């Protein structure tokens, strides 16, 4: 038997990445008290364009796929803490309050599939099929608070037991929103054939009852809060 691939594609990818990071920490000491404030921030953005061309042997069709998107990631983490020594190292209290935020965004992902029209000889001869736009926004918030207490019992030089106690609390919240829209190319008055330039397909001028119908394609997991 001779194995045959299911598909054979060649991809051309253009990618641009920008990053921004910041770190800010400080501490303050006075007497038996020490305070610390720690901060971390990161921002990452990626713009990408993919052009795929090849053959799908399942359908025995030559296809093209075009995808344009931007993704953004934001991360912040901050902590404020304190340590307090009381009564000549007999009692000690420390506490920490923290907050963290993370988000992921895809403000406008565009996807276009094209199929070769074997009966059309002039260029362009790929006709657009199933364009789609996708939006998503994910946000995570978390806050925490911890406190510890330590007491040393001065019984003798050979025996000095220590009592420790503490509390910890945490709160987390997540929201996710996503929307996807499909384009029904049922009307006329626009060019369905394109050669890697799909700006006309997504143009607002082409969205009408007699040209391109824009419909939302919902899913059960598109939006949730936890």
Predicted region positions:
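Solvent-exposed loop segments that connect transmembrane elements
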Residues: 2-10, 49-66, 111-131
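Face-selective signature of the C-terminal outer-membrane beta-barrel domain
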Residues: 29, 33-44, 71-226
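Short intrinsically disordered, low-complexity coil segments enriched in acidic
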Residues: 1-14, 64, 192-195, 224-226
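Transmembrane beta-barrel wall of Gram-negative outer-membrane proteins
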Residues: 1-49, 76-78
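Hydrophobic alpha-helical scaffolding
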Residues: 13, 65-71, 136
